[in-house]
Amino acid sequence: MSKKKDRLYGRLVYALSLAYNQAAFGKGKERHANNKPFEEQTMMVANRVTDGGFGWGQIFKKIQEIPNIKDPDMKKAEMVSIIVYAAGWVLWFEEFMKKGEARGNLDNITGVVGSKGLPRMEE
C-alpha cells in the first residue's frame, strides 16, 4: 500500500483489521470457528440455508442492541462484529450470484431473498 493510500484509507484498513482479528483470533475463533475456514463456519452455512437472512438478521439485531450497551469496549466489539457479519453476507451474495440464483428479488424492504410477502418501500 502506498503512503498516499495509507493516508487516505489507513483508518478503513484499521477497522477491517479489527474485524479480521475478532473473527480469526478473538470471539469468532473462540465461539464459532471449530477449526474450520471462515466460509465453512456456522455463519456461512446459516446464510446459505436462509438465503442470506441469517447475516441480515444478525446485523439488524446488533444495530438494535448496541445503543443499550454501556461498556465502551463491549460496544466497539459489537460494532466490529457487524463488519464480520457484513463480510459473510457479501461472500454469501457472491456465491449466490455465481450459482445464477439472483432473480431480481433482492430489492425488497429487507434486502433478503425470500421475503416477497413484505410490502415494498415507497420511493
Model regions: which residues?
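Intrinsically disordered, low-complexity regulatory regions
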Residues: 1-123
